[in-house]
């Protein structure tokens, strides 16, 4: 999973 940290995908 992508470590974006804003979509809740963290």
From Swiss-Prot:
Main location (coarse class): secreted
UniProt keyword list: Amidation, Neuropeptide, Secreted
Modified residues (Arginine amide): 10
InterPro entries (UniProt xref): Lem_TRP
GO CC annotation: extracellular region
Domain of life: Eukaryota
GO biological process assignments: neuropeptide signaling pathway
Secreted listed as a keyword: yes
Pfam family membership, one: Lem_TRP
Localization terms from the record: Secreted
Function: Myoactive peptide. Stimulates the contraction of the oviduct and foregut.
Protein name as annotated: Locustatachykinin-4
Natural source organism: Locusta migratoria
Lineage: Eukaryota, Metazoa, Ecdysozoa, Arthropoda, Hexapoda
């Amino acid at each position: 999973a992508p470590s974006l940290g804003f979509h809740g995908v963290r």
